Design a protein with these regions (language model features):
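A short, exposed loop/beta-hairpin motif centered on an aromatic-Gly-Thr core
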Residues: 20-24, 194-205, 257-260
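Short aromatic-glycine-(Arg/Gly/Cys) micro-motifs in beta-strand/loop hairpins
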Residues: 1, 171-198
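N-terminal "first-domain core" detector
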Residues: 129-177
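Short gly/acidic/polar-rich coil/turn motifs that serve as flexible hinges in modular proteins
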Residues: 27-29
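Intrinsically disordered, low-complexity, charge-dense segments enriched in Lys/Arg
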Residues: 78-83, 90-96, 101-124, 128, ...
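Ubiquitin system architectures
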Residues: 5-23, 32-130
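Long, charged/polar, surface-exposed segments that mediate recognition or autoinhibition
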Residues: 197-227
Length: 292
């Protein structure tokens, strides 16, 4: 029999070419024996968990692949008996393999989104634990001294602070996580379930992200105190939309600075006016109201 093997795309640009391949297989081959030699044939950074389905993307599941093929249904039946014409690798990015295996072994396909969120939460907790441990071994910190002072002045508190990671709580109880790598800084909020929601992404990494963070902390600080919102500063940075992403950009000293926001233009428009200000200016704007 001829069996078409396909898989989901795993990243942007991965869908520019077809992943399909067609194999000639003796019909008396059992499903278990056939699948034992199959892989998605793609390298994925981090957790790479797949649900293996008969037919297409919406076909019946028969097992999973996480570096090891696990056939959990119909393993002893032949391809001819099952009428197999296709195998699809359904990509479950971030899903913990052990939880997926536990559910499938019990005969249940779990909700994909819920399992992925659990995987991300576990990963974020590991990141937080590592940052806490790192902070105990070094005096280097992600946020500038000015941003640390702003957090305190605006009713917040820093709970974990390491060289590339900071978790803090604002005056209204909202938890924020700020991270940085060699290319970008990222600011996220964390909900009660432990899920992160991206607030903005910034380049170059460093103080640029602090402008949005401190402006957000300032706005919530005033709201908790029953104060009127401040008038945004006159330093305007143009907001535009490209490729489904709302952003602002400006060039300073020959270096392009950029802030990206999701899911719409509301956040980009709200925080663009602060992008060219220094953190102490933003703090003063919200606490004193005299920075222009």
């Amino acid at each position: 029999v001829k069996v078409t093997v396909d898989r989901d795309s795993v990243a942007m640009g991965d869908d520019t070419e077809s992943h399909e391949r067609t194999l000639d297989v003796p019909g008396e081959t059992t499903l278990g024996a056939f699948l034992a030699h199959l892989t998605p044939e793609v390298s994925v950074a981090g957790s790479a968990t797949w649900v293996v389905r008969l037919g297409g993307r919406d076909g019946e599941w028969v097992g999973m692949y996480d570096g090891q093929m696990r056939v959990l249904r119909e393993a002893e039946r032949t391809l001819t008996d099952l009428g197999v014409t296709g195998i699809h690798f359904d990509y479950w990015a971030g899903a913990p393999a052990e939880l997926l295996l536990e559910s499938l072994a019990a005969g249940r396909l779990p909700a994909k989104d819920a399992l992925q969120r659990e995987g991300w939460r576990r990963g974020w907790q590991v990141e937080d634990d590592r940052a806490r441990a790192k902070a105990a071994t070094t005096t280097r910190r992600l946020l500038s001294a000015e941003a640390v002072a702003a957090v305190a002045a605006l009713g917040g508190r820093i709970e974990v602070h390491a060289p590339s990671y900071c978790r803090l709580v604002g005056a209204d109880g909202t938890t924020y996580v700020v991270t940085a790598d060699q290319h970008w800084s990222r600011v996220s909020t964390v909900d009660e379930a432990g899920d992160r929601q991206g607030l903005g992404t910034f380049r170059p990494p460093g103080p640029l992200a602090e402008t949005t963070l401190v402006a957000r902390l300032g706005a919530t600080w005033r709201a908790t105190r029953g104060l009127d919102p401040v008038e945004p500063p006159r330093h305007r940075t143009t907001v535009s939309r490209s490729g489904g992403i709302w952003r602002w950009t400006f060039t300073d000293g020959g270096v392009e600075h950029e802030g990206r926001y999701w899911p719409d233009g509301t956040l980009a428009a709200a925080f663009a006016p602060y992008a060219r200000l220094e953190v102490p200016e933003i703090t003063a704007l919200f606490t004193v109201g005299d920075a222009r």
